[in-house]
Amino acid sequence: MSDKPDMGEIQKFNKSKLKKTETQEKNPLPSKETIEQEKQAGES
């Protein structure tokens, strides 16, 4: 067993088989407005 990858396998790979996917943020960061509202809600 060698540590080097099999380059022949990589060159044979058919990129057209891959599907284009839209990446979507699963847990987007809150906006500055949201953070400010939460800070104010916590203070009162």
Swiss-Prot record:
One of its GO terms (biological process) is regulation of cell migration. It is found in: Cytoplasm, Cytoskeleton. GO terms for cellular component: cytoplasm; cytoskeleton. Its main location: cytoplasm. The keyword Metal-binding does not apply. Belongs to the thymosin beta family. This is Thymosin beta-4.
